Amino acid sequence: MGIIKDRQGFTLIELLLVIVIIAMAVAVAAPNIGSGNQTASLNAAAREIASALRFARGHALTHRKETVFLLNLEGNTYQLTDRKKVYKITKDIAVTLDAAQSQIIDKNQGGIRFFSDGSSTGGRITLELGENKRQLDVNWLTGQVEIDGW
């Protein structure tokens, strides 16, 4: 019996080395997967609120009457005047509002008013989730909405 020189397959050492490399890659990638979900959730909330603000501005322009975006910080909800539906923001997201004093109802409620010419009272809505933060700025002169922090 001779020694077989052309054996096909992998040695135990080679297989263990591949398993160690895969384990290291998973250990590095796993923490980033969770933060990606947080970022996606925060971005989605920012886009939804920005869309509602833009809708409020458009509604004020087309119907030639004031429209108010109302934000409830305690309940993490918002709604528009002339609409009964209350929209929810994920409870994990911390929301703050910096608005004109005339639009502050109490410490937990306030809003941004859009006028029939497209202008507004202006303001900033800040969304925070973990270390991630998004700011929605409403220009008082033009009523335009921008999202900062992408």
Regions found by a protein language model. Give the residues of each.
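N-terminal helix-rich module
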Residues: 2-4, 16, 24, 28-54, ...
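N-terminal signal-anchor/signal peptide hydrophobic helix marking the start
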Residues: 8-20
